[in-house]
Amino acid sequence: MTPPPTVAVRDARADERDAVRVLTLRAYAEYATVMTPASWAGLDGAVRAALASDAPAERIVAERDGVLLGSVHLFPPVVDAYGALAGRAPWPELRLLAVAPEARGLGVGRALVAECVRRARRAGASALGLHTSASMRVAMAMYERLGFERAPEHDFQPPGAELVQGYRLRLE
């Protein structure tokens, strides 16, 4: 899993926080049309809260020619990336993977996931986890192509919303 040559992956700078927020909200806006209103309200609120949070996470971006194309957060294993809903897993958690609509199909998501895998391995993690839902079909298919497997013991269901499905990539 190596990034496409035209996409640079790096840590987000502090002055890019608002740009990352705007990019992420634009990327996730498509789900408003495919989720139930309750599921969308829950996801939108959770994404906005996570973006505003100062929780310890590595904030990673992908860019080309100085233009942000995508972002992801990588939470350490000691941090509960979803509050009390999912509980803590013993591995890092990839969250808020977002690719600008105009950059889809360029390998940006794959490059960001590859960077999370690289960092998790460097930290000595035995696995890398993530959560997704049936509404996120394109992302789910990409995760499965990259070797992530279902970890249903880490599923959770917010009240009135669709099931949030746990996935894990074994790194050992």
Where on the chain are the PLM-derived regions?
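Actinobacteria-biased recognition of intrinsically disordered, low-complexity terminal regions
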Residues: 1-5
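Bulky hydrophobic/aromatic packing residues
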Residues: 28, 82, 106, 119, ...
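Conserved phosphate-binding and hydrolysis motifs of nucleotide-dependent enzymes
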Residues: 66, 70, 107-109, 147
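Conserved glycine-rich acetyl-CoA-binding loop
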Residues: 96, 100-114, 121-123, 134-141, ...
